[in-house]
Amino acid sequence: MRGSELSLLLLALVLCQAPRGPAAPVSTGAGGGTVLAKMYPRGSHWAVGHLMGKKSTDESPSLYAADRDGLKEQLRGYVRWEEAARDLLDLLEAAGNQSHQPPQHPPLSLQPTWDPEDGSYFNDVQTAKLVDSLLQVLKEKGGTAS
């Protein structure tokens, strides 16, 4: 046991005699800067990537006010387009609902009867001739059957 205590005591004395100071040597170079400044010429290494692309807030406040007004106007335009699209969808939906409903016809008892002798229903001459020929065929079949 005595040997292990002696080795611990010697280790403590050696450690106490070691120079105390920063982990990296702080020596000034020829330009007056420290060695760390030469290692990281752009400043503290943790903030270099973090602050890239950042701008000062007090550079030009008038530009930010102009941007804010432009953004408000752009937002108003988007709102107008959204309202117009919503109105269009409502109209399309209403038109779609109407197209799915059957057409409204008056009851059969109120509809006028068709007179085969009356040619007012046929404005086209060819259609009238076709109907006349069909009527003749039907009359012939009716005459032979009786």
UniProtKB/Swiss-Prot annotation:
For this protein, the record's Pfam families field holds: Bombesin
Q: Chief subcellular site?
A: secreted
GO molecular function, a single term: neuropeptide hormone activity
Give the protein name, as stated in the record. Gastrin-releasing peptide
Q: What happens when the gene is disrupted?
A: Contrary to wild-type, mutant mice do not display imitative scratching after observing spontaneous scratching behavior in another mouse.
> Per the similarity annotation, which family is this?
Belongs to the bombesin/neuromedin-B/ranatensin family.
Ordered alphabetically, the record's keywords are: Amidation, Cell projection, Cleavage on pair of basic residues, Cytoplasmic vesicle, Mast cell degranulation, Secreted, Signal
Q: Which residues carry this modification: Methionine amide?
A: 52
Species the sequence originates in: Mus musculus (Mouse)
Q: Name the coiled-coil region(s).
A: none
Task: Quote the biased-composition stretches of kind Low complexity, using this chain's numbering.
Answer: 94-112
